[in-house]
């Protein structure tokens, strides 16, 4: 068994244990492998071990990997900040976008989604920690944004995403994820997705209702931050 396959098995066990501890069916928690800065060969290895969903932050890097891996049935999720001039290739080449935080971006994604493709699954990114350096809409702006995005014809609004302020305190982790869950429930729009939790806090996220956990380091090892950030 490869190192990546071993890591996938370990993370799957963590997900299973966390879901069971929360009284949830482990099948309701999706494992999104964050493959940013990792080579296509690592994605291919993860696919061979059973993964199908991969998250990317950097558009040009992602498009290169997608071309290399076109022979595989993969679902690609864009999870990084979105610039207006990058929306067309995102709309054309991804199945999910987790990081929509303003209406202009959502409108462009809807307008640029090719007619032959199903609606693009989107999550709205919320800045639950109030950090000035973090992307995401403010919680008080979320209801209006969600109502507007839900009307766009080529998008399917699925739920919310957050990247809370990193903390080793389990209570603080739970509080941030609970906040996102409450925001989703308050919208009362029948949405089904909470994209939250990473390698160090997936247990707390699952305890508060995560349906996608975004895992990079625990699967692929430490990231190569020298990779191109375009």
UniProtKB/Swiss-Prot annotation:
<comment type="similarity">
    <text>Belongs to the pyridoxal phosphate-binding protein YggS/PROSC family.</text>
</comment>
<dbReference type="Pfam" id="PF01168">
    <property type="entry name" value="Ala_racemase_N"/>
</dbReference>
<comment type="function">
    <text>Perhaps involved in proline biosynthesis.</text>
</comment>
<comment type="function">
    <text>Pyridoxal 5'-phosphate (PLP)-binding protein, which is involved in PLP homeostasis.</text>
</comment>
<dbReference type="InterPro" id="IPR011078">
    <property type="entry name" value="PyrdxlP_homeostasis"/>
</dbReference>
<protein>
    <recommendedName>
        <fullName>Pyridoxal phosphate homeostasis protein</fullName>
    </recommendedName>
</protein>
<dbReference type="GO" id="GO:0005737">
    <property type="term" value="C:cytoplasm"/>
</dbReference>
<keyword id="KW-0663">Pyridoxal phosphate</keyword>
<dbReference type="InterPro" id="IPR001608">
    <property type="entry name" value="Ala_racemase_N"/>
</dbReference>
<dbReference type="InterPro" id="IPR029066">
    <property type="entry name" value="PLP-binding_barrel"/>
</dbReference>
<dbReference type="GO" id="GO:0030170">
    <property type="term" value="F:pyridoxal phosphate binding"/>
</dbReference>
<feature type="modified residue" description="N6-(pyridoxal phosphate)lysine">
    <location>
        <position position="36"/>
    </location>
</feature>
């Amino acid at each position: 068994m490869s190192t990546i396959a071993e890591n996938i098995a370990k993370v799957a066990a963590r997900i299973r244990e966390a879901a069971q501890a929360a009284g949830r069916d482990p099948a309701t928690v999706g494992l999104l492998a964050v493959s940013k800065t990792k080579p296509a060969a690592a994605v291919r290895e993860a696919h061979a071990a059973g993964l199908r969903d991969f998250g990317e932050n950097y558009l040009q890097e992602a498009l290169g990997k997608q071309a290399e891996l076109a022979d595989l049935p993969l679902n690609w999720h864009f999870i990084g900040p979105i610039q207006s001039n990058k929306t067309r290739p995102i709309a054309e080449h991804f199945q999910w976008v987790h990081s929509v935080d303003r209406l202009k971006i959502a409108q462009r994604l809807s307008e640029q989604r090719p007619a032959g493709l199903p609606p693009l699954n989107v999550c709205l990114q919320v800045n639950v920690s109030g950090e000035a350096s973090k992307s995401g809409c403010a919680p008080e702006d979320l209801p209006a944004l969600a109502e507007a995005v839900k009307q766009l014809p080529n998008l399917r609004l699925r739920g919310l995403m957050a990247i809370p302020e990193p903390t080793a305190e389990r209570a603080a982790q739970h509080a941030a994820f609970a906040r996102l869950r409450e925001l989703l429930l308050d919208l009362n729009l029948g949405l089904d997705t909470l994209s939250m939790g990473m390698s160090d806090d997936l247990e707390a996220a699952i305890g508060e209702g995560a349906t996608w956990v975004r895992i990079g380091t625990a699967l692929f090892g430490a990231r190569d931050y020298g990779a191109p950030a375009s």
